[in-house]
């Protein structure tokens, strides 16, 4: 048994991990599936990721297009440079939060067409919570942050993501 010596009396739910199990979970070769391998993805900016590679990743989604004369892929590329976060990681985060809707179905929180919050964008769903008014909360957050263009929302949101996660040693 690997009972932890730091456990309090009566706290028998936690056990120390064996060296063998730690080695297993730290070895990416044990997780070579199309889903589990991504837990080892380096989230920091990779200079080899070009705008064209980002274009391929977002092809057919709501990010396959442009706003204010700039392609979303270019915005994500710029956000990666400004934040130090991998462009792939940023795209994955946006898809995780908003889905991959087809090009014609822009998620409401990034459409800029909300009656109460016109020209406000939140690509990372900051401020949203589970419940009925999650979109309103996300748009309120974006309004207070000054995210009034898609470019600003993508770049500044990436900086926030990086400062609260990647740059904290996570």
Go through the PLM ranges and name each one.
Residues 58-66, 70, 119-148:
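Substrate-binding clefts and substrate-entry loops adjacent to catalytic sites
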Residues 114, 132-143, 153-156, 160:
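Extracellular protease catalytic domains of secreted zymogens
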Residues 1-83, 159, 165-170:
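Cell-wall glycan-active module
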Residues 50-51, 108-129:
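Short, surface-exposed glycine/acidic/tryptophan-bearing loops
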Residues 91-94, 158, 162:
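Non-transmembrane alpha-helical segments in soluble domains
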């Amino acid at each position: 048994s690997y009972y932890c010596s730091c456990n309090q009396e009566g706290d028998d739910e936690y056990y120390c991990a064996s060296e063998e199990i730690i080695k297993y979970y730290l070895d990416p070769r044990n997780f070579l599936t199309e889903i589990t391998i991504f837990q080892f993805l380096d989230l920091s900016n990779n200079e080899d990721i070009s705008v064209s590679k980002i274009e391929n990743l977002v092809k057919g989604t709501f990010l396959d297009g442009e706003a204010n004369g700039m392609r979303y892929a270019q915005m994500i590329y710029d956000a990666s440079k400004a934040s130090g976060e991998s462009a792939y990681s940023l795209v994955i985060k946006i898809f995780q939060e908003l889905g991959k809707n087809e090009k014609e179905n822009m998620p409401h929180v990034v459409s800029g067409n909300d009656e109460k919050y016109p020209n406000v964008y939140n690509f990372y769903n900051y401020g949203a919570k589970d419940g009925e008014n999650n979109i309103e909360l996300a748009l309120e957050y974006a309004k207070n942050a000054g995210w009034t263009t898609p470019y600003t929302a993508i770049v500044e949101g990436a900086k926030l993501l990086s400062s609260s996660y990647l740059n904290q040693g996570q």
